[in-house]
Design a protein with these regions (language model features):
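Long, low-complexity, charged/polar intrinsically disordered regions in eukaryotic proteins
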Residues: 1-31
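Short acidic, hydrophobic short linear motifs in intrinsically disordered regions
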Residues: 43-63
Length: 100
């Protein structure tokens, strides 16, 4: 098994501030789909992003996985959800709902 370099593990460095959503999609729309995938226990960012992307596709929302991941990072940075690890590395970081 070859060891991955950090660059090879990075899935996306897109920042939410750099995202331009299509007119048919709002940040609130994405938040609903992302929160539907979250739980109190830690989940890999890759899982949350992948399932939110499936939900977007099922609703014909033209949103990429990079955009969803950027929104997840923005939610963590805003303190809306919790995250651990380098969130640009989807398989090596996790998110969850804030424990109350």
């Amino acid at each position: 098994m070859s060891e991955e370099s950090e660059e090879e593990r990075i899935c996306s460095t897109l920042r939410w501030d750099d995202v331009r959503l299509p007119q048919s999609v709002s940040a609130a729309d994405l938040d609903v789909l992302i929160f539907h995938e979250l739980a109190q226990n830690w989940l890999k960012v890759a899982r949350v992003v992948g399932r939110a992307k499936e939900a977007c596709d099922a609703r014909s929302l033209p949103v990429s996985m990079d955009v969803i991941a950027a929104r997840v990072r923005a939610l963590v940075e805003a303190g809306t959800i919790e995250g651990v690890g380098n969130l640009t590395m989807w398989r090596h970081s996790e998110v969850r709902l804030i424990a109350r």
